[in-house]
């Protein structure tokens, strides 16, 4: 059955518009530099690999916060400072340092131009489990809204965050196209909510056999923009 033209789009951010791990590594180094200067005992006790392990441990201890990376990070920092004998007053400044670096991203080569093309034709909701700041990154004007797992209280692939996107955009599930890189979080999550999906498969990966396939698949966001322009062209105005 042909995919009907969408009335709106929802778009994942991390690993869809930019690669996330270089960004996280950059932020981890910025945090460690801050701690080395302001809280050297914490920096010595928690080098980057150990701080990463601590964050995973904290996340495991607080499964009810699986949707909130910000609180997970702050709890990790508070634990590290307390354990090392430094003052927990530094938690917010340490987090702010990490977060500023987390928002210094490098777009995939095609992503920004493709986003501009899509935003010129459809209302778009950013739909993310992460905590990127679209204003800091400079792309907030391309989106109608940024819907986060933290704000909704549910993370992808759970249906409530997808339903929230539909409600916010004022469309039915069958009128939304969700776009993202993750087979489970984006594609299977959208399918469970009755929403069509486009898999952005930048690494030419094989589709997991145990998941429902995407409705569309492209190697880049530009590929999706090209397909939509061809499949659903703008009509020229009547003279």
Locate each region found by the language model.
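N-terminal helical cap/lid subdomain that shapes the substrate entry/recognition surface
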Residues: 2-109
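Asp-based, Mg2+/Mn2+-dependent phosphohydrolase catalytic module
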Residues: 1-9, 21-22, 86, 112-125, ...
């Amino acid at each position: 059955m042909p995919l009907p033209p969408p009335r709106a789009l929802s778009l994942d951010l991390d690993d869809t518009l930019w690669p996330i791990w270089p960004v996280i590594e950059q932020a981890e180094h910025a945090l460690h530099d801050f701690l080395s200067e302001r809280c050297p005992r914490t920096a010595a006790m928690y080098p980057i690999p150990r701080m990463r392990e601590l964050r995973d441990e904290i996340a495991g201890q607080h499964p009810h916060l699986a949707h909130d990376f910000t609180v997970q990070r702050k709890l990790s920092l508070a634990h590290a400072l307390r354990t090392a004998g430094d003052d927990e007053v530094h938690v917010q400044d340490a987090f702010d340092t990490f977060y500023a670096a987390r928002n210094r991203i490098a777009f995939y080569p095609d992503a920004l131009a493709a986003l501009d093309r899509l935003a010129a034709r459809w209302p778009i909701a950013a739909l993310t489990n992460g905590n990127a700041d679209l204003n800091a990154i400079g792309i907030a004007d391309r989106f109608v809204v940024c819907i986060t797992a933290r704000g909704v209280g549910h993370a992808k692939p759970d249906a409530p965050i997808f339903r929230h996107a539909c409600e916010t955009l004022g469309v039915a599930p069958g009128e939304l196209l969700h776009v993202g890189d993750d087979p489970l979080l984006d594609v299977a999550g959208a399918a469970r909510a009755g929403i069509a999906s486009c898999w952005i498969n930048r690494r030419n990966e094989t589709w997991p056999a145990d998941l429902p396939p995407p409705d569309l698949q492209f190697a880049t966001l530009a590929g999706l923009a090209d397909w939509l322009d061809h499949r659903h062209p703008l009509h020229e105005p009547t003279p």
